[in-house]
Amino acid sequence: CRCRPDWFNGTAVVDLKSCVDASSRGFSRAIANLGYDIQAAFYVDGMKAVTGTELPFLFVAVEKEAPHAVALYRADPEIIEVGRKKCRAALQLLKWCQDAGSWPAYQPGGEIELISLPRWAANTDAFEFDAA
């Protein structure tokens, strides 16, 4: 395991995150949307392997826009547990891909898929020109 916490003092793992919305509601969305739960679990487990103790994980959320509001959050146990489950699933998928020599993406069966322009881009009326 390799991790680089932004700050570690032996009592907590701290990660600094820039965000659009540092409110608890906004930042909890960022945690879910950006996979910060996976990172938190990985860091907590990695530091436990080194220290022998499961330490709290703290997020320092800093808004990108002035006045750059700041909030400090401690990840609740559910965040860590959900992150662990996602991490385990990702590692199982990685192992399967390596063992099978297959890296499925958008066409897992290898089929060729027909693709079309989006409806808005196929509007040819916008491109007609009357020179008369």
Question: Which residue stretches match the model-derived regions?
Answer:
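Alpha-helix initiation and capping sites
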Residues: 1, 8, 33-37
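Metal-dependent nuclease catalytic cores that hydrolyze phosphodiester bonds in DNA/RNA
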Residues: 1-3, 107-108
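Conserved catalytic cores of phosphodiester-cleaving nucleases, focusing on short active-site segments
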Residues: 3-29
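Metal-dependent nuclease catalytic regions and adjoining charged, substrate-binding loops involved
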Residues: 32-37, 42-132
